[in-house]
Amino acid sequence: MTQRLGSSAAFLSAGGYHHHIGLNTWQSRGGPAPAPDMTGLYHTAVLLPDRKSLAAVLHRVLEAGIALEGAADHGVSEAIYLRDPDGNGVELYRDRAEAEWPRAADGSLAMGTEALDLQVLLAEAE
């Protein structure tokens, strides 16, 4: 997160750019939230270039006091999950090189969801 305007807007970026994504509640403030069983956006995923970038983003998210909803190692990728100001899900992730993807004995992809060690990841931000 590069900038936050109270609880009404946040600007996200990677690589030093001022912002790639702007999130705000300017038009929706005070409006009703959709019912939990309604269709709609589940989450937006933002691909980061490498593990060091994911670590740097995690550091900034935590420094800004934004709560994480989760963190996972999917075998092919590592991801952190949070909510935007409107409550929409945001996934920030990095892909592993295809040569590192987990494979079953028959060669098929063996993705999963394991805990992501955030302390080990954060050490890469330093």
Task: Name each region found by the language model.
Residues 17-18, 39, 45-101, 109-111, ...:
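Vicinal oxygen chelate
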Residues 7-8, 13, 28, 53, ...:
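Generic serine detector
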Residues 1-26:
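Core segments of cupin and vicinal oxygen chelate
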Residues 29-34:
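Short beta-strand/turn micro-motifs at beta-sheet edges
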Residues 5, 35-37, 73:
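Short glycine/proline-enriched turns and hinge-like loops at secondary-structure junctions
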